[in-house]
């Protein structure tokens, strides 16, 4: 049966790029296999189904999976069905089935209308509509069947060819289910990295004390790559928290890999620990944490393109589920060797059998975090098999001949035969022992080599047959490498050096001589027989190379069997000296050394070491370059590097010295180093200090005062700030000879302090007036920068004006007060200065003061009164005048009465008594605490007071009168006067 697409493509264009989002569900071979498996399992579960559906309605309206259900299905979106038929009672289950059937019946018509509309929106052919109807029917049956058993999770990805690559399907089916125990199976099939994997598992879950504990085992089968493994897992769940641990163990060995040519593969053994948690207060927000590790030499934990040895990874992520239908999240995966990747997740969790409204309800999210709705969740494990890879042996090497035996110096050709799919890039030899013994192995081509046997080695033992054989046997190993980087097996070439009739030994005397053409190196060759006895009179041909002299001589050995050569050279390097006698050859390396530049013999200097950074003044940098013998070295490629400033052109003086000027317009310290032939030269570096011009430029410098006005109190200060800048715009630090000169009233200037960007001092004074201050450096007066500071008198209360009198401020005025009593405070000897202050009273409204310093008393006071004048120009300065009255004065009436009546009226007015004579007047105006002495005639303050006589008392029974106009006391009887009452306060 062939399933046809049920709708056509939807083309979406965005920003000039075309992106196809498939609306078509086309089941391929994998889906057909899965359907068949589900149908077979369905037959076995029919009995169980009848048990749970015994009381259900016999006919349930099918729920159609139409094309509209998949219109929003993009790659990596998941449709999840979680139906738990075994967790509820029969009555509850029947009610749920009926309710679901009603919901499905209500939505079926809409689904069919959308499905039909999608089909008619296609090409319009009748056959396409028919095929789509068949596809709808199949989808309807699959979904209805899945709704009956367990939990299914489908992840369908469709590419432009309608294949199901990177798709997956998992299904958990409960076989035995009770309130506290669940036995289930889980079937899964998936496609990832072009591999189809089948997962078969069984498990149990049990509920104890609010925790769900589970064990499971899985068989994982890579159907495409023929890999098999078994998995063991454990679970521990509770509300809002899920913990899991899994182990994975391979069941098959190495076999050819389908991912890499020339590689084998097998499952990697490993395991993981997983945790998923959700916030009870905010169940929409969840987090995950996973640790996984696998063992092996080349394990593809981060994909087949990132193979690692014993890799591990830690994954941390957060997710947010605003409604049950949608989950978004981000995972950060970090592994070995700084491997990391970020995964953004968008998951559609469509629960088949539930209304669409419930899946868009935020309040439904909390229930999905509880055990009641999660006991049928799929097992949390890695269903994809992690693979380990191993390089295959694809190149085979053989050597011809495989063994060589000959005399010293004999030459043999060695041929390499290589079998492999790719051409040979090189043959790698392990021939260090042969080369060290004096033999050579020279390539003629990639696979052909000339081998020259080394000298024969003689041992010192008397019986040395076996030792000689061992000492002159060499085992050379070779392996071939093709252009793909593949290496062959190692092949061994056995080399035996036969004993010659004569032997040659060499000794070098004076090696490492200078290559000056004068100093010689002596090489002595000793010729001996097979027993090591020196042979005299043997002709030895000695040759040299690399331009040495002589280049060839023939010498006869002396009585000690020694032939000598003394060679010189003007070319440094290795000179090979070779001696030959009767077919025997012996070579030895000699070394001529040309003097090389030496940092410990060379010097670097800077003159001068401190200059002004004006871009004109220069420090001369000089290098004296010498070799190891202390000789000057001219003509070298010398460069100076500086960390600051500009280095001029280097001049070679042809005597081993090199110099260049260094200038700068930037302040700081320049460090100069040397390079020779582009490489760092370790001669000690030198430093040059670029400073500012010590003479400040008036046009660029600045001079400021923090405030131009201060009080002449010796405390308030103004801060002077001088910023000296030279003509190049540089701040001058460490300035010497700086002072601030003054002209005007005398002031005190503190010592000058250097700040990071200025020079500061403070000014205070005690004399009012103006002073001008000018910065001066030595004899240079910067008159254009001078500033003026004005010193003002300290605010002072100088007098109290009371009814024509000016009282001193220290006499405690007033002691007596009355309604509408007024006086004026005088600031700085003139009431005209009162407007320069802000006035306030501490006892308002009884005592008030205006902006002229006029104080008015409207009612009696009960404590000390403070009248404060705050300077408007210097708000931090204020002056307060304080007084504490002790008598409140009041006229007992406006009628003339007798002394007895006056006493009665004062007492009747709640006054203590008639004012005592001693508190009434002394006959003179003075701040003496008497009423008339302080205030004079009270008629000047209010019309409530009358001119004439007022009763006062000398004693409690002896009365006399006081004239309000003159303040005079009149003794003797008086018949009528005004009452003058007083209340102690």
UniProtKB/Swiss-Prot annotation:
Residues 494-985 are extracellular. Keywords: Disulfide bond, Repeat. Residues 795-985 are annotated as: Integrin-binding. Gene3D superfamilies: 2.60.40.1080, Immunoglobulins, Inverse autotransporter, beta-domain, Mannose-Binding Protein A, subunit A. InterPro entries: Big_1_dom, C-type_lectin-like/link_sf, CTDL_fold, IAT_beta, IAT_beta_sf, Ig-like_fold, Intimin-Invasin_domain, Intimin/invasin_bac. Residues 695-794 are annotated as: D3. The keyword Disulfide bond applies. It comes from Yersinia pseudotuberculosis serotype I (strain IP32953). Residues 503-594, 601-691 form the Big-1 domain. Residues 595-694 are annotated as: D2. GO terms for biological process: cell adhesion. Belongs to the intimin/invasin family. SMART domains: BID_1. Residues 795-886 are annotated as: D4. Residues 887-985 are annotated as: D5. This is Invasin. Invasin is a protein that allows enteric bacteria to penetrate cultured mammalian cells. The entry of invasin in the cell is mediated by binding several beta-1 chain integrins. PROSITE patterns: BIG1. The keyword Disulfide bond applies. Disulfide bonds join 906-981. GO terms for cellular component: cell outer membrane; cell surface. It is found in: Cell surface. Residues 494-594 are annotated as: D1. Pfam families: Big_1, IAT_beta, Intimin_C, Invasin_D3, Invasin_D4. It comes from the Bacteria.
């Amino acid at each position: 049966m062939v399933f046809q697409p049920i709708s056509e493509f939807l083309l979406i264009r965005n920003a000039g790029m075309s992106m196809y989002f498939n609306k078509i569900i086309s089941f391929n071979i994998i889906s057909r296999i899965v359907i068949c498996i589900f149908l077979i399992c369905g037959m076995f579960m029919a009995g169980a189904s009848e048990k749970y559906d015994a009381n259900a309605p016999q006919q349930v309206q099918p729920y159609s999976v139409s094309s509209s259900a998949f219109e929003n299905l993009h790659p990596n979106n998941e449709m999840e069905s979680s139906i738990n038929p075994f967790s509820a009672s029969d009555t509850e289950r029947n009610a749920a089935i009926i309710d679901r059937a009603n919901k499905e019946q209500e939505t079926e018509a809409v689904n069919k209308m959308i499905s039909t509309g999608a089909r008619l929106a296609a090409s319009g052919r009748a056959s396409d509509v028919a095929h789509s109807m068949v596809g709808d029917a199949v989808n309807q049956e699959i979904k209805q069947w899945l709704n009956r058993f367990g939990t299914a999770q489908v992840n369908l990805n469709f590419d432009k060819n309608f294949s199901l690559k990177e798709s997956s399907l998992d299904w958990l089916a409960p076989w035995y289910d009770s309130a506290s125990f669940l036995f289930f199976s889980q079937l899964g099939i998936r496609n990832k990295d072009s591999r189809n994997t089948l997962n078969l598992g069984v498990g149990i879950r049990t509920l104890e004390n609010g925790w769900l504990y589970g064990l499971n085992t899985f068989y994982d089968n890579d159907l495409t790559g023929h890999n098999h493994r078994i998995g063991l897992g454990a679970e521990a769940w509770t509300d809002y928290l899920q913990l899991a641990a899994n182990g994975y163990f391979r069941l098959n060995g190495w076999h050819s890999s389908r991912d890499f040519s020339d590689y084998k593969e097998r499952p990697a053994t490993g395991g993981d620990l997983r945790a998923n948690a959700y916030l009870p207060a905010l169940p929409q927000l969840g987090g995950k944490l996973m640790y996984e590790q696998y063992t092996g030499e080349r394990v593809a934990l981060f994909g087949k393109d990132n193979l690692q040895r014993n890799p591990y990874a830690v994954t941390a992520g957060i997710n947010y589920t605003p409604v049950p239908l949608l989950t978004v999240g981000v995972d950060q995966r970090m592994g070995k060797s700084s491997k990391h990747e970020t995964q953004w997740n968008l998951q559609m969790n469509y629960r088949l059998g539930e209304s669409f409204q419930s899946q868009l309800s935020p309040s439904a999210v909390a229930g999905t975090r509880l055990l009641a709705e999660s006991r049928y969740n799929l097992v949390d494990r890695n269903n994809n098999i992690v693979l380990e890879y191993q390089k295959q042996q694809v190149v085979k090497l053989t050597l011809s001949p495989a063994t060589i035996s000959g005399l010293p110096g004999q030459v043999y050709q060695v041929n390499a035969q290589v079998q492999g799919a790719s051409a040979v890039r090189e043959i790698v030899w392990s021939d260090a022992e042969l080369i060290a013994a004096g033999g050579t192995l020279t390539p003629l081509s990639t696979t052909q080599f000339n081998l020259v046997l080394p000298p024969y080695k003689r041992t010192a033992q008397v019986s040395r047959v076996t030792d000689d054989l061992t000492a002159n046997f060499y085992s050379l190993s070779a392996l071939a490498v093709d252009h793909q980087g593949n290496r062959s097996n190692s092949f061994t070439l056995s080399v035996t050096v036969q004993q010659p009739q004569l032997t040659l030994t060499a000794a070098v005397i004076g090696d490492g001589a200078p290559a000056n053409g004068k100093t010689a190196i002596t090489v002595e060759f000793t010729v001996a027989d097979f027993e090591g006895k020196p042979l005299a009179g043997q002709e030895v041909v000695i040759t040299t190379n690399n331009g040495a002299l002589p280049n060839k001589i023939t010498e006869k050995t002396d009585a000690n069997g020694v032939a000598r050569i003394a060679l010189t050279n003007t070319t440094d390097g290795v000179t090979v000296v070779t001696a030959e006698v009767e077919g025997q050859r012996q070579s030895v390396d000699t070394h001529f050394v040309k003097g090389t530049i030496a940092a410990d013999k060379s010097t670097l200097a800077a003159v001068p070491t401190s200059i002004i950074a004006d871009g004109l003044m220069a420090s001369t940098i000089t290098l004296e370059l010498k070799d190891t013998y202390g000789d000057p070295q001219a003509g070298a490629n010398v460069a100076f590097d500086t960390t600051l400033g500009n280095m001029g052109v280097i001049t070679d003086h042809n005597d081993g010295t090199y110099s260049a000027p260094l200038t700068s317009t930037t302040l700081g310290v320049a460090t100069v180093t040397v390079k020779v032939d582009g490489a760092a030269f370790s001669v000690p570096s030198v430093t040059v200090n670029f400073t500012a011009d010590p003479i400040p430029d008036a046009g660029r410098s600045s001079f400021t005062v923090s405030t131009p006005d201060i009080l002449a109190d010796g405390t308030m200060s103004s801060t002077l700030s001088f910023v000296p800048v030279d003509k190049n715009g540089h701040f001058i630090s460490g300035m010497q000879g700086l002072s601030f000169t003054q002209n005007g009233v005398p002031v005190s200037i503190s010592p000058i302090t250097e700040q990071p960007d200025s020079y500061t001092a403070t000014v205070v004074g005690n004399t009012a007036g103006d002073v001008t201050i000018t910065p001066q450096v030595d004899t240079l007066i910067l008159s254009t920068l001078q500033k003026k500071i004005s010193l003002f008198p300290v605010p002072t209360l100088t007098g109290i004006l009371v009814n024509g009198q000016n009282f001193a401020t220290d006499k405690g005025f007033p002691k007596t007060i009355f309604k509408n009593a007024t006086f004026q405070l005088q600031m700085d000897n003139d009431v005209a200065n009162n407007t320069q202050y802000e006035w306030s009273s501490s006892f308002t409204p009884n005592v008030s003061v205006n902006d002229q310093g006029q104080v008015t008393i409207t009612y009696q006071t009960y404590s000390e009164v403070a009248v404060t004048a705050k300077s408007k120009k210097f708000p931090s300065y204020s002056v307060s005048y304080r007084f504490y009255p002790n008598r409140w004065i009041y006229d007992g009436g406006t009628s003339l009465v007798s002394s007895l009546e006056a006493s009665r009226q004062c007492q009747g007015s709640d006054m203590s008594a008639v004012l005592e004579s001693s508190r009434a007047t002394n006959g003179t105006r003075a701040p003496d605490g008497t009423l008339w002495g302080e205030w004079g005639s009270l008629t000047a303050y209010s019309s409530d007071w009358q001119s004439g006589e007022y009763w006062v008392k000398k004693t409690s029974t002896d009365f006399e009168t006081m004239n309000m106009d003159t303040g005079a006391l009149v003794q003797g009887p008086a018949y009528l006067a005004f009452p003058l009452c007083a209340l102690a306060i």
